[in-house]
Amino acid sequence: MRKWTVPSVLFLLCPSLSSSCQGRKIHANAEADSDAPVDPPKVEDKIGAVPNGLSTDSDVAKREAESMSMRNLRSDAEKFEFQAEVSRLMDIIINSLYSNKDIFLRELISNASDALDKIRFLALTDKEILGEGDTAKLEIQIKLDKEKKILSIRDRGIGMTKEDLIKNLGTIAKSGTSAFVEKMQTSGDLNLIGQFGVGFYSVYLVPDYVEVISKHNDDKQYIWESKADGAFAISEDVWNEPLGRGTEIRLHLRDEAQEYLDEFKLKELVKRYSEFINFPIYLWASKEVEVEVPAEEDDSSDDEDNKSESSSSEEGEEEETEKEEDEKKPKTKKVKETTYEWELLNDMKAIWLRNPKDVTDDEYTKFYHSLAKDFSEEKPLAWSHFTAEGDVEFKAFTLLPPKAPQDLYESYYNSNKSNLKLYVRRVFISDEFDELLPKYLNFLKGLVDSDTLPLNVSREMLQQHSSLKTIKKKLIRKALDMIRKIADEDPDEANDKDKKEVEESTDNDEKKGQYAKFWNEFGKSIKLGIIEDAANRNRLAKLLRFESTKSEGKLTSLDQYISRMKSGQKDIFYITGTSKEQLEKSPFLERLTKKNYEVILFTDPVDEYLMQYLMDYEDKKFQNVSKEGLKIGKDSKDKELKESFKELTKWWKGALASENVDDVKISNRLANTPCVVVTSKYGWSSNMERIMQSQTLSDASKQAYMRGKRVLEINPRHPIIKELRERVVKDAEDESVKQTARLMYQTALMESGFMLNDPKEFASSIYDSVKSSLKISPDATVEEEDDTEEAEAESGTTESSAAEDAGAETLDLKDEL
């Protein structure tokens, strides 16, 4: 007989299932039949009701009630002792302080599903094995009894023989149990349950007494019971109604586990963990309805007796007529009553198991709203539905929401929460990890369903699982392809030469502007991906969008930029700043714009970090136009100008020695501005300096190191620069000329986006310049205030305060009297 792992122990195997490939066959057939209609149980049906053709003992109910009330092992049952390791295991589980006890229901439903899978597989070759009537219904039922504090889970699966009950509920492979106990003692994490084949023992998280009633087609009905005290008992079941076939588990809940007698709690757990189980899950749920009941005589309306005697005779006649008609009608009233009926909890089908070609857009949209708990009417921007085959087989379904959550980036690096849910054989495992998708794609909603990952896999084991890297790699590729497809189908994203052709071939206006919508919501995530994911950096770069000096207020891509590059242009030009308006006025763009070069405008703070990682694209380097190294063609007069201003540049560098200026050079980027300050190629730009200085925990020493060298570039064609050269040639020691040179440098710093180290000094220089232009003597001083008037004012204030204090004291005295 094949050994099955204990997560499916409850509803165990059949001796005929010996082939190693049967498990896969079971699931394959389960998928094929998953949409088969199943009639819900009737309202009057009971868990464990007698199937057609079977009789019941008249004293069954009495003996059953006595057994439940005692919560003791039956005296005539055959008793067994658990293995030593199992006893230790249950002690750890029961006494653990770990809060997630909810997994017990997931385990039991998963086991029930396994049992139903097995009986359905056997029925493929022998239809009679299913039986008739209710016994043939492949479903799971959950029922609770608040008075007796019992939670019952029932299935009509394969059931267990007496031997199965002993073998699978009382023993575990010693090596697996020992390893599990050791792991539990060190980590205390109950999510490890099931990884070592001990899933059934999670039931001891909530009850102090467990009954497992099971009927296999090849054996009598037996009852397995345990109080988790190191022993269990098995006896032929003569206390309960015949099951027909299948298993029912009754959990006699401890006082501290009464929350699991709440219908809402059970519905929530089923929705969370077992929503896509292959079989219908029903809950015996209460429901308030209004019903009409006969009204008592005292409740009958006697409004006619209280009518005012002043009523008109006509009104009286009408009332008499109405009264006669009312007397003819049966007297009833509406009251609220609590009724019970079987409520289907998992009506949402696992559409990822179907062929994508067979799923409609409306079905995808409906599934998105259910999965994402999005109650708006907006459709997802896109979705990706695929099956991966090969060494690792899994099905995946990812969706792109229409809007980003408000807190998407608030805890970007600190949260383990993922919007991608992991399922194993349609059983929800976890969303408390980020190993299946990188953080920058965490805005995607969806799920992964794998048959190769172990059930109840923990975050720690998931990180080490050999299949994980393969799954992650395929998910990333499919996600980026999905996003790329939005751009490819958007007419606004076509190159200028292809736009007309795309617009003519596109008859779906819904796709127009979709990528701009995506970028406005999730563009920052793509930039973070370029920073974090070196392997997919080029793919992500194709998804970048930005404004430029030629984009006319619209977003453009790197491919579109390259298609518009001038002949002979080797670099991709860009500049960073706080806003588009500020950058368009930047002196760094003057000559580039004049020569019709396109410059990318980066205005997001993350763009500074982005460009530290995105060094090139399609064999073209990126060049920050506010840094050294800008090449935009040579001027025939460059050498002549450089020689002509050699004396000025040398003098100016010396005059700015205290400002830590590395050099003064002739500029090739200025047209109308006299001078600008640029930084070294690998140093921080002015925008980056401002960002880093705003950081709460910034390191001053690192800032000084990363600031880079500053170079003053002058415009040799500007009249101010020409005049300054003449002044220097005439008298290089003129203090006013030196002051003018320093003032121009400080002004250039501000215009280039830098922050001044000493704003007060700069302001004083400006005021001195204003004095000079107004022909005010440099020795002129500010008129001093008259101290006498100030002293008299202070004296008057003191006397007034004293008078007010005296008046206040008088009032206080009057109040006391």
Curated annotation (Swiss-Prot):
<dbReference type="GO" id="GO:0016887">
    <property type="term" value="F:ATP hydrolysis activity"/>
</dbReference>
<feature type="glycosylation site" description="N-linked (GlcNAc...) asparagine">
    <location>
        <position position="456"/>
    </location>
</feature>
<dbReference type="InterPro" id="IPR001404">
    <property type="entry name" value="Hsp90_fam"/>
</dbReference>
<dbReference type="GO" id="GO:0005524">
    <property type="term" value="F:ATP binding"/>
</dbReference>
<feature type="region of interest" description="Disordered">
    <location>
        <begin position="777"/>
        <end position="817"/>
    </location>
</feature>
<dbReference type="InterPro" id="IPR020568">
    <property type="entry name" value="Ribosomal_Su5_D2-typ_SF"/>
</dbReference>
<keyword id="KW-0067">ATP-binding</keyword>
<feature type="glycosylation site" description="N-linked (GlcNAc...) asparagine">
    <location>
        <position position="111"/>
    </location>
</feature>
<keyword id="KW-0256">Endoplasmic reticulum</keyword>
<feature type="compositionally biased region" description="Low complexity">
    <location>
        <begin position="794"/>
        <end position="805"/>
    </location>
</feature>
<dbReference type="Pfam" id="PF13589">
    <property type="entry name" value="HATPase_c_3"/>
</dbReference>
<keyword id="KW-0106">Calcium</keyword>
<dbReference type="GO" id="GO:0051082">
    <property type="term" value="F:unfolded protein binding"/>
</dbReference>
<feature type="binding site">
    <location>
        <position position="155"/>
    </location>
    <ligand>
        <name>ATP</name>
    </ligand>
</feature>
<dbReference type="InterPro" id="IPR036890">
    <property type="entry name" value="HATPase_C_sf"/>
</dbReference>
<feature type="site" description="Important for ATP hydrolysis">
    <location>
        <position position="459"/>
    </location>
</feature>
<protein>
    <recommendedName>
        <fullName>Endoplasmin homolog</fullName>
    </recommendedName>
</protein>
<feature type="compositionally biased region" description="Acidic residues">
    <location>
        <begin position="781"/>
        <end position="793"/>
    </location>
</feature>
<feature type="glycosylation site" description="N-linked (GlcNAc...) asparagine">
    <location>
        <position position="416"/>
    </location>
</feature>
<dbReference type="GO" id="GO:0005788">
    <property type="term" value="C:endoplasmic reticulum lumen"/>
</dbReference>
<feature type="short sequence motif" description="Prevents secretion from ER">
    <location>
        <begin position="814"/>
        <end position="817"/>
    </location>
</feature>
<comment type="similarity">
    <text>Belongs to the heat shock protein 90 family.</text>
</comment>
<keyword id="KW-0325">Glycoprotein</keyword>
<feature type="compositionally biased region" description="Acidic residues">
    <location>
        <begin position="293"/>
        <end position="325"/>
    </location>
</feature>
<dbReference type="GO" id="GO:0140662">
    <property type="term" value="F:ATP-dependent protein folding chaperone"/>
</dbReference>
<keyword id="KW-0143">Chaperone</keyword>
<feature type="glycosylation site" description="N-linked (GlcNAc...) asparagine">
    <location>
        <position position="306"/>
    </location>
</feature>
<keyword id="KW-0732">Signal</keyword>
<feature type="glycosylation site" description="N-linked (GlcNAc...) asparagine">
    <location>
        <position position="624"/>
    </location>
</feature>
<dbReference type="InterPro" id="IPR020575">
    <property type="entry name" value="Hsp90_N"/>
</dbReference>
<feature type="binding site">
    <location>
        <position position="168"/>
    </location>
    <ligand>
        <name>ATP</name>
    </ligand>
</feature>
<comment type="function">
    <text>May have a molecular chaperone role in the processing of secreted materials.</text>
</comment>
<dbReference type="InterPro" id="IPR037196">
    <property type="entry name" value="HSP90_C"/>
</dbReference>
<feature type="region of interest" description="Disordered">
    <location>
        <begin position="31"/>
        <end position="58"/>
    </location>
</feature>
<feature type="signal peptide">
    <location>
        <begin position="1"/>
        <end position="20"/>
    </location>
</feature>
<feature type="binding site">
    <location>
        <position position="200"/>
    </location>
    <ligand>
        <name>ATP</name>
    </ligand>
</feature>
<dbReference type="InterPro" id="IPR019805">
    <property type="entry name" value="Heat_shock_protein_90_CS"/>
</dbReference>
<keyword id="KW-0547">Nucleotide-binding</keyword>
<feature type="region of interest" description="Disordered">
    <location>
        <begin position="293"/>
        <end position="333"/>
    </location>
</feature>
<feature type="binding site">
    <location>
        <position position="111"/>
    </location>
    <ligand>
        <name>ATP</name>
    </ligand>
</feature>
<dbReference type="Pfam" id="PF00183">
    <property type="entry name" value="HSP90"/>
</dbReference>
